[in-house]
């Protein structure tokens, strides 16, 4: 056990006897399973016990092979060599698959980023807003999982929410330039037109016939349609209330409002972090899920 602890990442294979003075072979295997070492370190058990129950238990505990005594040294050598070679090939395959997944995810993020930048460019903004939303969304999600386990926020889900957050305003593609880029406050009628961007964005994603049921697209749809909903039901377009609003949309809504407050706009100057948080907590930008406030109430300014 002490050798496993000391050389864990450097061990190529363990030859394990069943009968040992302090801890038997099954005990060692159980210990390795508890620490997930058995996934990375192949074990060959060598034993004089040849009953089916012993062999089955050994394989159930994760051994790669079981050699019965007495044994031939050359046969043991070949089986050790074959096991090490097999595990090495598996590791190379896992690395290859991981690289392919990484490249696919990187390309997905790149295409989404390009599309979102097009929207921001048309909206007359620098494109930094999308990057800010990504960063703030990720920070809020990280704090949210520390605060509660109420939501399904696995690493994969959080990653998709962060990626999809870049598309939150994609519906603005369908808004008239004169309204979208008006250098002043909007009239009530113009604001009603702007509000349609959430439905337009969701409809665009719904029209993706072959991809609309993909998890990333579903999350992006929820964010597009409902990132202007508010926890008290006074948002738009559907007046959803409380937990009727998907957590993805709740988090992006808060990130969107916070970034809008701390950023310069044609109709206003940027507020400080402290002032922005104060305005959000006072409900000046609508009501949000109290749990999601956690990150913004930290004393340190968010670096975006």
Residues covered by each model-derived region:
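Active-site beta3 strand of CheY-like receiver
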Residues: 9-15
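Receiver (REC) domain active-site loop signature in two-component systems and cognate sites
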Residues: 20
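Metal-dependent catalytic cores of enzymes that make or break cyclic nucleotides
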Residues: 120-296
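Single conserved hydrophobic/aromatic residue that forms the stacking wall/gate
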Residues: 295-304
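C-terminal output helix
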Residues: 53, 71-80
């Amino acid at each position: 056990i002490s050798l496993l602890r000391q050389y864990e990442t450097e061990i190529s294979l363990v030859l394990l006897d069943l009968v040992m003075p302090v801890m038997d072979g099954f005990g060692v295997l159980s210990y390795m399973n508890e620490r997930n070492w058995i996934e990375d370190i192949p074990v060959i058990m060598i034993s004089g016990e040849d009953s089916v129950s012993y062999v089955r238990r050994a394989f159930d505990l994760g051994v790669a092979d079981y050699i019965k005594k007495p044994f031939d040294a050359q046969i043991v050598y070949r089986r050790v060599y074959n096991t090490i070679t097999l595990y090495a090939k598996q590791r190379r395959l896992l690395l290859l698959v991981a690289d392919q997944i990484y490249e696919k995810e990187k390309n997905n993020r790149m295409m989404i980023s390009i599309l979102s930048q097009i929207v921001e460019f048309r909206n007359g903004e620098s494109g930094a807003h999308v990057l800010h939303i990504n960063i703030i969304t990720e920070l809020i999600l990280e704090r949210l999982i520390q605060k509660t386990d109420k939501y399904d926020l696995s690493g994969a889900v959080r990653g998709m929410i962060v990626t999809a957050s870049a598309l939150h305003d994609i519906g603005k593609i369908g808004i008239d330039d004169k309204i979208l880029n008006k250098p002043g406050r909007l009239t009530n009628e113009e604001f009603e037109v702007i509000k349609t961007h959430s439905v337009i964005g969701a409809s665009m994603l719904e029209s993706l016939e072959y991809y609309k049921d993909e998890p990333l697209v579903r999350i992006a749809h929820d964010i597009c349609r409902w990132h202007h909903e508010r926890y008290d039901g006074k948002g738009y377009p559907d007046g959803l209330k409380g937990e009727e609003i998907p957590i993805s949309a709740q988090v992006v809504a808060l990130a969107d409002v916070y970034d809008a407050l701390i950023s310069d706009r044609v109709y206003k100057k940027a507020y400080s972090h402290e002032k922005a948080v104060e305005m959000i907590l006072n409900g000046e930008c609508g009501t949000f899920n109290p749990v999601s406030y956690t990150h913004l109430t930290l004393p340190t300014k968010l670096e975006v």
